[in-house]
């Protein structure tokens, strides 16, 4: 098994906001679109947030894409996780081709620590892409929650 498959991406950031507000930004599609990508990406997010139900995040970034997966955990204001496979990877729709994205929230008074953990990388390219994307996107989440008048 190549090394990248056993790699783990883990990032923790402290957001100056209540867990309630962070949770809204992570789970309300209208708010998710505000920090997950630029407006021209025209993101569309569909899910019921029920465990074992589908999630799709589609849009346009140089090419049309559809990221799909399944909700794995949904413990309100605590844990959210889902599987992830992008159409851009051109990998078969098989379980071994899905990464797992997980958010753990740890509230402390008026702040919330968010730990993002990503596991299971079917290819090195996917590992590098997710590392690159989430390096900046987790910071965008923080800025959005701390500065948004929408929450």
Cite the ranges covered by each PLM segment.
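Hydrophobic-ligand binding "helix-grip"
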Residues: 46, 61-108, 119
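Intrinsic-disorder/low-complexity, polar/charged segments enriched in Ser/Thr/Lys/Arg/Asp/Glu/Gln
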Residues: 6-12, 19, 54, 66, ...
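A conserved amphipathic terminal alpha-helix motif
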Residues: 119-151
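Hydrophobic pocket/interface hotspot
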Residues: 22-23, 32, 55, 71, ...
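Short beta-edge strand/loop motif at the mouth of beta-sheet-based domains
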Residues: 10, 30-66
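Hydrophobic ligand-binding cavity/cleft-lining segments
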Residues: 1-42
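Residues at helix-coil transition
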Residues: 27-28, 76, 146
